[in-house]
From Swiss-Prot:
This is Ubiquitin domain-containing protein 7SL RNA2. InterPro entries: Ubiquitin-like_dom, Ubiquitin-like_domsf. Belongs to the ubiquitin family. The lineage of its organism: Eukaryota, Viridiplantae, Streptophyta, Embryophyta, Tracheophyta. Transcribed by RNA polymerase III (pol III). It comes from Arabidopsis thaliana (Mouse-ear cress). Residues 1-53, 184-263 form the Ubiquitin-like domain.
Amino acid sequence: MNVDIDTETGSSFSITIDFGETVLQIKEKIEKSQGIPVSKQILYLDGKALEDDLHKIDYMILFESLLLRISPDADPNQSNEQTEQSKQIDDKKQEFCGIQDSSESKKLTRVMARRVHNVYSSLPAYSLDELLGPKYSATVTVGGRTNQVVQTTEQASTSGTAKEVLRDSDSPVEKKIKTNPMKFTVHVKPYQEDTKMIQVEVNADDNVEELRKELVKMQERGELNLPHEAFHLVSSELPLIETKSFKWNRVADGDTIELIREK
């Protein structure tokens, strides 16, 4: 994803941010491009400093602007009292994200980053019928149980999209569905145009990479064709972090996961 960096002086530059990069890696790219040391950079989002070891997906940097503050050089001749006063002023500026205008703020260079291009903004759209009820589909279980493919021929009805309540087999009392069930079903849309949608049952706590492994096994069995090129698993136009769980990626029951070829 290409991002333009605009400064208060009117100059600008551009950097490319990849899907799985951490905040520290973004700072290193700025240092390599502009010569600004990583130790001088502080990235803010919604008034909070970003942690170097977290990924850009953690902060939804795909859709939000960043504020880059460059710390001024320290004065070796400054007294302890002056240092403490400067620290207090700096804390106030950090709290207000440098919005207030003061003489001290002129020592800082602020850089605003905004998203200008998303490689997935032009993804093909699918109809509601394609997503909810393909005529021929397969159900695969990913997790502790033996994987099994089941062919179904029923056409899903859009009127049946409401979630049902669970009933205890030994009791007529209804129980509400949990917010994050241990197992749930996702719909996988193959990269190649196909009339079938693959239904896969996954564990909420399993990493997304388990789904990729299962798709490779299905290809080996001749049940689907994966892209020849490297591809990403994408849900709601956001790439999934495969080393994290489905729950961490906020994948819910009934969500659609697409296979998008790497650009």
